[in-house]
């Protein structure tokens, strides 16, 4: 950093992967895990141009560690459902997602590399609206039930509802 002279490097999680979710399986933590998506999980249609293809590859790469974590949670939930795992050993997490795929589908990978103040303001406003919408629609589910159907996610069906 030229301003401070510090030589430490910082990399956004998207370059290395999302933080691990398994520490949250511990019974001492609240069961709710709220994921705030910054990349769409799915898109309608097939990318055709080189830019669209590169953007989708970027999204898939960025989401790959999240999807692996969600598959692990799906397995834990299956073990709980079959009474092969108990809460005192590993919690049965409740999964929620806050997303704004409309905005995220409009953005390209380049917009994430060179964010402009106007874009950041737009994303902040969209994020606040998405969080408010999530709480309005699913606030009563917190602490009680999932708002994401992981089985449907991995079967390719509707995931949030």
Name these PLM-found stretches.
Residues 1:
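Ligand-binding cleft/hinge of the Venus flytrap
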Residues 4-161:
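Non-catalytic peripheral regions of patatin-like phospholipases
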